[in-house]
Each structure stands twice: as C-alpha cells, then as structure tokens.
C-alpha cells in the first residue's frame, strides 16, 4: 500500500440480526471474528473512519453487548477496543454507551481469571490493547467512574481467580493508568491495593511449597513501584482518612487495631517499595511526638521494626529526623513507650552495626531507667542477642557497669533476671570471646562479674543466696570433668576477685564442712527413725528431737523453709537406700570429682521423676512436687558438697611447674592455704608430696617459682598435720632433722612453721628444749637469725611455755631493753612506705620492726600461758598489768616508746609507730578473749581504743576493725568492745564504711544477738564512750560554737548507731536505757577524781555532786533523737516493762537521795535546745530518705583526698612529759593535737567543710617504767 493511502474497511456483512435477516449465532461469531481481524489490522492514522461508522454503532447494540454467547461478547469487546483505538483521541460514543462498553470489558476481564475458557486469547488481546493505547482511561471520565473503578479492582484482587503471571504487568499497567486519571481514588480501592501488603507476604511461604503468585499482591507492587508519585498521594490520603476515622471513634481497642494495621502496611511498604514511605513518614514522625500514648508506643515499635527490616534504602540516613525522634523515646514520659523502645533493640543489634553509637548512648540510660520494666527489658537484651553480637555492637562501658549494678536491684524480678543473665553472659564470654586490645576495657568490667555475684551474699537475703548458689555452679564453675580445665576455670574466676569477694568465697567453702556434716547426720537420723526397733528404744525421742533440729537448721538457710522441711521429710519417708547412698556420697569429704558428678546427676534425676510419689506410695497432697524436692536438694548439695575444694583438685593446685602466670601461681597458693585451714584432710594423699618438697629444698633462700616454696610447703603440711597427725611420719630422721635445722637457722616464716610442726611431734618437748639451748641467750648484734629466734620463743610460749620457765625473765627483760626501748632504725626515710604489711616483717629490710612486732606477740603468748595463774599469783598479776599498760601506752602514744631525750634511738620511724600501735590493739583484742586477762582492760582503756578506730592510717583502722568485728560477731570478747564499732561514723574510706555498716546490720540480725539484745544493751556503753571522747570532752568544757559543735558531733555518733539499731520493737528499751543513764554516776569520772585527790579525799568535806554531767548530756541527746525518730516513723511509745541495771564497770548508783536528785535536771542549755532539735530533725530526715551508707558517700569522697594526703605526711610524734613533770602530779595530759579538736559543724552542717576534718588521735603519753627495781624482776613459774 502506498504511503498516505487511506484504507477502507473491506468487511461488509451485517452483524445485527433483524426480523428480515436473522443471523445465527455461529454465523455471527464468524462475522465478528472476521471484523475483529480486519479492524485489528487497520492503522489508526490511515483508516477511512466513515467506513467504520456503521459498525461503530452496531457494536454498541445491546444485542451484541448483552448476547448470551460468550464468544460473541468476547469478539464484540475486541472490536470495540479497536474502534476506540482507531477513533482516538475522541471516543465515538456517548457516556452511556461507554459505560455499557466498559461493563462488557470488565466482564471479559473477569474471564481472564479462568485460563481454560475458550476465548482467553481474545480477552488477553482486549486487555493488552486497552493498555497499549490507553483506551482504558476513558473510564475515568464517566459519571459512574468510581463504581467502575471499584469493580475493575475487585476483579483483579479476587483471591478466587487465577490470572496468569505473564499478565501481571499488563494488569498492573491497566490499573495504574486508570487511577492515574483519578484525582481522588475511592477508599475501597485503596484498601484493596494496600491491604494486599498485610494479607500476603511471599517471604512467609514455607520453602518447597509450589504456590502460585498472588495477582493482587503483585499488582499492588507494580502500582506502588511504577506509579509511585500518584500512589504516594493516594497513600497519604488513605493513611490520613483511616487514622481520622479511627480517632473520631472513642473505642481505643479499635484505634489500636487500625494503627497496628497501618503500621504493618508501612513496614511492608518499607520492605518492598521504600520510596513510598515518604508519603507517610510525616505521620509517623508526629505519632512519635503525639500526646496520645498509644500512637507513641506503636510508632516506636514500628521504627524499631523498620530498622531491622531489609530494604534498598537506609532508614537512618533517608529519614534522619524520624530516627532521631525515635531515639528520643528512651526519655518518653510513658514507661510503656520506653519498654517498647527497649524491646526492639535485640533485633536491631543482631541485624545492623551502623547505628551502634546511637544505641550505646541510649541503652546506657535504659539500664538506669526509673521504671523496673524498662530495666528488665534492658537486661533481656543480653539474653536475646548472641554474645558475639553483644561484644561487637555494645561498646559503652556504662551499659556493662549498669548491668552489674542491677544485681542489687530492689525489684525481685529484675534482680533475678540480672543475676542469671550476667552469670550466663560471663560464661559465654569466657568461652567465645577473645581478649584483644580493643575490648580490654569491657573485659575489665566483665571480669568483675564473679566478684559482683559473690558480694551478693553480703545482702544476706535467702532468695538471693539461693540464686547465686545456682548460677555459680551452672555458669561460673560448671561441673567440668577434666581436672586441669576445672581448676583453670576456678583460677580464672578468682583472678579478678576483690577483697570482699575473696572473703565471701572462703566463707562459702568454710561453711561447706558444717552443712555436709549436718546432711550426714540427717541421713543417719533418717535411717534410725525408719527402723521401728530403733524408734521403740530409749534413744528414739532423743534422735527424733535431733532430727527435727537438723531439719530446722538445714531449712533455715533456704528461702522457703517450709518447703525445704517437707522435701527432707519426704526423702526420709522414701526410705530408699540408693537415695541415701547418693546423698551421703555427694557430701563425703574425699569423694573424687567425677564420682561426685555422677552421684549428683543420678540423685537429681531420681528426685525429678514425675512418678516419684507413686513409686514410693506416698501422698503429699499439693504441698510439694518432685521438682521442688530436687531443687531443695540441689541447693543443699551446692552448699554441702566438696565441689570447689575437691580432693581431685589438690594435685593440680600443687603442680606449679607448668604454669608461668604469676597471678595464677599466687591464686593456687592462696587456695591451698585456705584449704589447709578449713579442710586440711584433703591433703591426706599429698602429705608425702609435701614432705618431699621440704626435704628436697636444701637451699631455703633460693626462690623457686616452679613449685611450692619451702615456707608454703611447711605451712600447708602443718595445717594438714594438725588434723592428720597420724599421717605425718615424724620418725623420718632426715625429715625431722630438716625441721630442727629450719627452726634454728632459717628465715622467720620457715622457722615459724618448722617450730609448729615440731610441736606436733611426739618428741616436741625434748626437741624444743634442744632448740632453746641453741638460740639462747638472745643476742641482737651477733645473732644472724635473731628475728627467727624470737618467733621460735613465741611459739614455745604458745605450745610448751614451761620449757622456758627458767629463761622467761631474761628473755622478756632483754626484749624490752634491746628491742622495744631501742631502735635499729632511727627517724624517717623519704622512700619509706607508709604501712608495713605483715608479709614484709620476715624481710631482712624490715627486721627492726619485725623484731618489735614479734616481741609484742611473744608477750601475748606469755600472758596467755600465765592467765590461769593470774588470780592467785601476784607476780603473774603484776606482769599482766604492766604488759597491758605497755599495749595501751603504745596505742595512746601513737606507737612511740622511745623518750625524746634519748638522742641515740629517738624517734622511731613513723611507719614503725603506725604498725606498732595497730599490733598493740590487736594484742589487746586477743587477750580480751581470756576472762582472767579481760579484767585488766579498764573502761579508760576502751576509750583509748577509739584511737585505732579513728586512726589517721587506713590500714590501722581497717585491720583493727576487721579483728574487732570478727571477735564481736563470734561472741569471743565482751560487749564492752561493741561501742567501738560505732565510732566509724566519720570513716572517710568508702569501702570500710560500707562493709562496717553491712556488718552492723548483719550481726544485729543474728538470732543470738537479737535474743540477748546485745546491740541495744550496748547503748549505755556508747553514751559513756561518747561522753569521754576527747572531741566531746573538750567541746563540752568550752562555750559557744565549740560547745555546740561537740553536741552535733555526739549526735552524729548516736545517729549512726540508731540508724541500724532503732526499730519499733526495741524503741521502748532504747529510750529506757537512755533515761536510765541519769540514775547513775559516771564511775570513770569518780575514779579519776579519786586518783587526783588521793589521800586528801578523806580529809575534805563531802560534797553532793553527781559525777558525769557530760554523760547526762549525751543521754539527753539520745532521748531527743529517739523521740524525733518516733515522731518521723510513727512509732508507739510505751513504758519499758522491766528494770535493768547499767554496767557496774561504768556506772555507779548514787549514795544518797540528794545526789540522785541533782541529776534530774536538764543539762543541755535551754538556749541551744531549738538548734539541736532542728539539727536532729534535718539529719533524721536524710536518714529516712536514704540509707546511711548512701548518705555518707559524698562525705567519704570529700574526705578521701584528705585521707590520702594524711597518709603521705609523717605521723606526728607526741612528746612524753619529762620526769620532773611526772613528779608534780599524776594527772594525764592530752597531746597538742588533741587540743585542736575538729569542728563538728564542718562535719555536720556543711559539705564543703568535710575536707578540713582531722582524724583524732587520743594518744595520751604516760611514762611507764619497765625497768624499775631491776633486782625485783618478775619471775614466771
């Protein structure tokens, strides 16, 4: 055909039946087919349209459009599509005709869903041409366009129809072209489009299933991707209309449903067509800041999901404002929103690394959130995220630190989760995470997890104790069968312990012996009681009583004691020999670890059997289940079984040859040392090894790091030998000769334990006499082993004092003259350390102070040996009195014994003085354990001991307090020492103050202390001690601010006491004791006055005067504090029903009624009462707001600087008075430093003044002549 030629339609057959000319269906079908084929071939630009007019009109006839034959309608639709194409751009039909045409087209589209219909080709042609020539857009201009559009979309979104995948793009194009012509698309259509993202997700279809693609979903994807600009506008409309409709409804549940669906849509769009999110991100941003909590919570959840979803775009960079708004939700006012934010973190951490910095900063806040649910969710992150991802993405040290702090969380659920989580995290980290330079700082925190766990025992909460027991053996120290690996894990755990954790660890293992013994007795009692003959015997009731006591004791340490008793009682009822055997085997002292593990697993497995009760025909009701019994036994076995201190570990611990790590070597030695103390029988199989080490070490001065040192071997063998005397062969001549040689010529520590071992031998006395002959007489100048020989004598005085009966006087006289009253080292050295540790005393460099310390200990042992003779032996009494004066002189003088006029030996080095006064205090406490010697410690001496509690040296305070607390808690010394503990009120060291406070709370709660009201009955003694504290004495003797400051200082001491002790239950008793003080005179004051007046007292006329006005003032302060506490805490105040006498060593009843009446007046000046009341109220208010320990933290930090500085300074030397001064009077004089009392106003009223506090040293110097009447030297027999 020539170019430009017009083509005319050749087809000329009628297609409409008339009455004159009927056309059969088949004929009509053929004609329409022919017409369609020719129309399809015509070109739009070169066709004579006039030739088409006839068929243009005929094709819209209802006879064709509504024909019953499917084929006729199919070909009619195809012809009409061609007509529209050829007439384009103008449609040759009216709106009504077009409406009918599109209805026909839609009916054909429906048939596309049935690929088996005979006209699928024509229908495919139809949809293709309508898209290709955009004829379909004519639908948008029709009056019924909305209805047609809705119907069109319903066709292709019908889930019951199966459209061929090859047409998805065509269908998407058709729908896209149509809605592009609509300014406003019906909401129903938009629902169809967007709901497909909610109802269909190809990623959720299980792999392997041959599932055809969903047409509606694929079309929605095409629409949103290809027509994103138009769809963005429609999405905005859809989102806003849905939200608007929902918010106008008061039904919150419906609103939540709508918001959840919309957010799911946004998430799916982000995963599939992320560019479309721009249309609604503004809504999300505003939802994050909405006043409606529901919107904020769900928007927060949505962003969290978006951040974890895979997408072609990076949300953080694309929508940075919204991301920042999401980050800010960690500070949302609603805890539910903060919880939602935190819950999204685990998945985010596991899927992306680019926002680690922001997450680290935010998470540091969630761990310290005010709401426990947020804190709990934060902890859960460590459970949900693999440990490797945690280490990779969480790098903020504050997060790990906060995790550890939550182990002491007050909310049980958070605390328990945290304890379990951090133990598990620690274990997983050890197994999977390599230590590198990059993660060094995090490891430093993680390494403290074992310490944190062991320190939880100090809380003394039974629930916490049980959980810590469980996590220790589940995660920290799992039941590893390999001995070497198990010990290595133990050393790793211990390698970063702090002091408190070590104490807790050692206490745990010491307790194991007691609990294992109790369980063994429980088994014995159970077997006895299960035997009817035994029960019928006379021993039956006795054993039953012991059995019940044992059950009570074992159950008392468990959180649910009732359930524990039920569990143990049920096991007894089982009367199963195998269970008894397994239980007994698990607590056997020398059971190998593998045997223990097998027995433990079998026992727990048996007890967890669901049919346990049925097997033994026991009915327990619902009170206890098999799992409860298993849990109780697990906890008891964790505590009673030799798991850590196991006999299988000893050989590994003793083998130091293959370990070059100095820290682990030290830990092994430390563990061995503790085992030798608490369970030396474990060395039974190693005694031969220890003896071999001792015999092979010919050179005691040689340092060998590949094995136990000689000192350690001797020490370990000695402690094992004390329990296993029969296991040590003292008949081994070579070995015994070695011990003799070590005792005579060796280093101090070696000498000490060699002598101790000799003292255990059958030939002890004979050998010690030989040693005595070798080392006496003492000669400081010529004796190379002088220090060692003092130790030998010290041990002989302890074990066989009668061996030295003839030499005692000479020894003591020599040591006083040549050691205590002379100095090998004079004055201070710039490079000298402030504190000499006990471990250094055996060093040659510190032999001078070592000699003095061991001499004091020798004196103590000497006093112990003569203690039984003191009541009836004047010489023993005199020596005891003078030795006690020596100890208290050292304490009062600060450790200086040398006169300032002694140019040769004065002064003693400051660090020597520090050590000596501390050692003297410790010796006093040791002697106080012996009743006959305790009587020599006077009330005025107790006041001097406050020196050590408030000493300028932290090691002195710590060492003395630890010994004091240990003796008091174990009730080894008199109650008169207890008030000393409460003079730590101004303790500047955080750790020491905290541990002391914990100790007070713990000891106060002990059953024996509660029953005996020990702490309550210490109040009069505390009042008396405060009244004699130099700060108080000096202040109360003054006027103005000094007087008021003394009162506020006393208030602080009393408040420190009442903060831990006072409660509703003991209030009446405490108030009664405070009042009772005024019913007595201060005996200490009277005794001092009597000493000063001397013989002239009888000549002077008697005056009615109460002794102890200062004591009455402190008593009044005590009453004021208690009344304020009563008011603040709403306590009831009833008169104490009993009558108690105050301690006779401190308080003396009035001789006359007149004297008693003088004490009834008020001693606190009325002008100061209001100020004092205000001071007390303010401080009590702070106590109620926070614990004493927390309240003191700021003060401690401020004081820490001064404390550190004070240790750098040389200790002041207090000068003794001259002999001439002594002759003028016997009164004591305080040192210069005591005259400058510290200001309580600084301590109590202002925080910035804390740095000016000076720790008081109550060191009053007295001349005590230890060389008087040399001809009358004391002889000890």
Swiss-Prot record:
GO cellular component, one term: meiotic recombination initiation complex
HEAT repeat copies, ranges: 393-429
UniProt PTM: Acetylated by ECO1.
Keyword line: Acetylation, Cell cycle, Cell division, Mitosis, Nucleus, Phosphoprotein
Keyword tRNA processing in record: no
Region spans: Disordered: 1201-1277
Biased segments, Basic residues type: 1208-1217
One of the GO biological process terms: chromatin looping
Annotated function: Essential for the establishment and maintenance of sister chromatid cohesion at centromere proximal and distal regions during S phase. Also required for chromosomal condensation.
Protein name: Sister chromatid cohesion protein PDS5
Lineage: Eukaryota, Fungi, Dikarya, Ascomycota, Saccharomycotina
Gene name linked to the record: PDS5
């Amino acid at each position: 055909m020539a170019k430009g030629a017009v083509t005319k339609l050749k087809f000329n057959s009628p297609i409409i039946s008339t009455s004159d000319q009927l056309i059969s269906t088949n004929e009509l079908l053929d004609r329409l087919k022919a017409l369609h084929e020719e129309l399809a071939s015509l070109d739009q630009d070169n066709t004579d349209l006039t030739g088409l007019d006839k068929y243009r009109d005929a094709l819209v006839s209802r006879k064709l459009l509504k024909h019953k034959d499917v084929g006729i309608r199919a070909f009619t639709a195809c012809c009409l599509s061609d007509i529209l194409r050829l007439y384009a751009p103008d449609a040759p039909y009216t709106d009504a005709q077009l409406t009918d045409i599109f209805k026909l087209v839609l009916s054909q589209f429906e048939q596309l869903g049935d690929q088996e219909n005979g006209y699928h080709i024509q229908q495919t042609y139809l949809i293709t041409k309508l898209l290709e020539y955009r004829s379909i857009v004519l639908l948008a201009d029709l009056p019924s366009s909305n209805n047609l559009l809705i119907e069109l979309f319903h066709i292709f979104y019908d889930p019951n129809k199966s459209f061929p995948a090859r047409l998805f793009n065509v269908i998407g194009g058709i729908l896209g072209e149509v809605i592009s012509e609509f300014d406003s698309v019906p909401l129903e259509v938009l629902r169809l489009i967007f709901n497909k993202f909610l109802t269909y997700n190809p990623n959720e279809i299980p792999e392997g299933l041959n599932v055809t693609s969903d047409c509606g979903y694929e079309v929605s994807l095409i629409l949103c991707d290809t027509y994103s600009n138009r769809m963005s506008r429609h999405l905005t409309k859809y989102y806003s209309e849905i939200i608007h409709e929902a918010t106008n409804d008061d039904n919150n549940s419906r609103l939540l449903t709508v918001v959840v669906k919309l957010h799911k849509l946004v998430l799916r769009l982000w995963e599939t067509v992320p560019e479309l999110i721009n249309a609604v991100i503004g809504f999300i941003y505003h939802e994050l800041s909405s006043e409606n909590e529901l919107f904020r919570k769900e928007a927060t959840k949505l962003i969290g999901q978006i951040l974890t979803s895979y997408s072609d775009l990076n949300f953080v960079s694309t929508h940075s404002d919204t991301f920042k708004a999401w980050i800010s939700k960690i500070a949302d006012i609603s805890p539910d929103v903060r919880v939602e934010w935190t819950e999204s973190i685990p998945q985010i951490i596991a899927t992306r690394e680019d926002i680690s910095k922001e997450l680290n900063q935010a998470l540091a806040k969630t761990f310290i959130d005010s709401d426990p649910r947020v804190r709990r969710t934060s902890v859960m992150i460590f459970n949900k995220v693999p440990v490797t991802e945690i280490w990779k993405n969480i790098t903020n040290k504050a997060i790990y630190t906060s995790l550890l702090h939550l182990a002491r969380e007050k909310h049980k659920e958070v605390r328990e989760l945290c304890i379990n989580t951090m133990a598990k995290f620690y274990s997983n980290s050890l197994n999977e995470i390599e230590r590198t330079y990059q993660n060094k700082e995090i490891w430093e925190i993680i390494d403290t997890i074992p310490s944190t766990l062991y320190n939880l025992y100090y809380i003394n909460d039974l629930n916490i104790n049980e959980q810590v027991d469980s996590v220790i053996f589940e995660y920290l120290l799992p039941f590893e069968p390999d001995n070497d690996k198990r010990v290595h894990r133990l050393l790793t755990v211990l390698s970063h312990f702090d002091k408190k954790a070590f104490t807790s660890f050692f206490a745990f293992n010491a307790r194991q012996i007691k609990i294992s013994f109790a369980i063994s007795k429980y088994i014995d009692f159970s077997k006895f009681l299960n035997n009817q003959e035994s029960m019928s015997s006379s021993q039956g009731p006795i054993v039953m009583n012991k059995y019940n006591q044992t059950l009570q004791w074992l159950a008392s340490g468990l959180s649910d004691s009732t359930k524990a008793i039920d569990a143990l009682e049920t096991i007894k009822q089982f009367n199963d020999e195998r269970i008894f055997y397994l239980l007994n085997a698990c607590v056997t002292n020398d059971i190998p670890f593998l045997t223990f593990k097998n027995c433990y697993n079998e026992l727990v497995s048996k007890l967890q059997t669901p049919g346990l009760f049925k097997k033994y025909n026991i009915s327990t009701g619902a009170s206890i289940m098999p799992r409860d019994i298993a849990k109780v036994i697990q906890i008891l076995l964790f505590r009673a079984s030799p798991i850590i201190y196991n006999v299988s570990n000893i050989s590994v611990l003793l083998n130091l040859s293959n370990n070059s790590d100095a820290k682990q070597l030290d830990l092994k030695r430390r563990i061995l040392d503790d085992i030798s103390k608490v369970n030396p029988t474990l060395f039974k199989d190693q005694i031969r090894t220890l003896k071999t080490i001792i015999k092979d070490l010919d050179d005691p001065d040689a340092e060998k790091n590949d094995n136990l040192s000689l000192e350690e071997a001797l020490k370990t063998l000695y402690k094992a030998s004390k329990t296993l005397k029969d296991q040590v062969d003292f008949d081994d001549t070579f070995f015994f000769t070695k011990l003799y040689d070590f005792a005579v010529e060796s280093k101090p520590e070696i000498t000490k334990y060699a002598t101790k071992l000799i003292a255990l031998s059958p030939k002890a006395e004979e050998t010690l006499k030989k040693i005595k002959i070798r080392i006496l007489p003492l000669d400081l100048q010529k004796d190379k082993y002088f220090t060692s020989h003092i130790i030998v004598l010290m041990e002989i005085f302890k074990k066989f004092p009668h061996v030295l009966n003839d030499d005692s006087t000479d020894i003591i006289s020599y040591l006083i003259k040549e050691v205590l009253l002379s100095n090998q080292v004079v004055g201070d050295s710039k490079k000298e350390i402030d504190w000499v540790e006990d471990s250094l005393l055996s060093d040659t460099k510190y032999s001078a102070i070592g000699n003095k310390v061991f001499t004091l200990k020798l004196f103590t042992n000497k006093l112990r040996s003569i203690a039984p003779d003191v009541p009836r032996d004047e010489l023993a009494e005199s020596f005891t009195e003078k030795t006690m004066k020596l100890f208290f002189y050292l304490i009062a003088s600060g450790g200086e014994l040398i006169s300032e006029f002694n140019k040769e030996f004065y002064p003693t080095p400051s660090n020597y003085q520090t050590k000596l006064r501390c050692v003297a205090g410790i010796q006093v406490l040791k002697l106080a354990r012996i009743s006959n010697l305790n009587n020599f410690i006077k009330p005025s001496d107790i006041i001097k001991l406050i020196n050590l509690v408030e000493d300028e040296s932290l090691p002195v305070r710590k060492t003395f307090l630890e010994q004091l607390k240990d003796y008091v808690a174990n009730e080894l010394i008199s109650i008169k020492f207890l008030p000393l503990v409460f003079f730590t009120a101004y303790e500047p060291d955080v750790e020491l103050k905290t541990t002391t406070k914990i100790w007070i709370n713990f000891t106060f709660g002990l059953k024996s202390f509660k029953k005996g009201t020990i702490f309550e009955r210490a109040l009069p003694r505390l009042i008396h001690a405060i009244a004699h504290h130099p700060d108080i004495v000096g202040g109360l003797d003054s006027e103005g601010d000094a007087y008021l400051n003394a009162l506020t200082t006393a208030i602080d001491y009393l408040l420190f006491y009442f903060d831990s002790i006072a409660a509703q239950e003991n209030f009446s008793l405490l108030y009664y004791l405070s009042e009772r003080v005024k019913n007595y005179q201060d005996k200490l004051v009277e005794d001092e006055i009597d000493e000063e007046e001397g013989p002239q007292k009888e000549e002077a006329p008697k005056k009615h005067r109460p002794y102890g006005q200062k004591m009455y003032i402190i008593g009044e302060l005590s009453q004021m504090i208690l009344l304020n506490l009563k008011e603040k805490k709403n306590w009831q105040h009833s008169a104490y029903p009993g009558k108690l006498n105050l301690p006779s060593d401190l308080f003396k009843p009035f001789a006359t009624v007149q004297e008693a009446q003088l004490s009834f007046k008020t001693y606190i000046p009325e002008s100061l009462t209001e100020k004092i009341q205000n001071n007390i109220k303010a401080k009590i208010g702070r106590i109620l707001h926070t614990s004493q320990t927390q309240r003191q933290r700021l003060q401690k930090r401020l004081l820490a600087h001064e404390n550190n500085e004070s240790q750098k300074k040389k200790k002041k030397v207090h000068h003794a008075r001259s002999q001439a001064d002594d002759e003028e009077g016997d009164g004591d004089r305080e040192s210069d430093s005591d005259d400058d009392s510290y200001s309580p106003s600084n301590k109590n009223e202002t925080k910035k003044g804390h740095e000016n506090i000076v720790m008081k040293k109550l060191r009053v110097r007295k001349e005590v002549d230890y060389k008087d009447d040399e001809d009358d030297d004391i002889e000890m027999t």
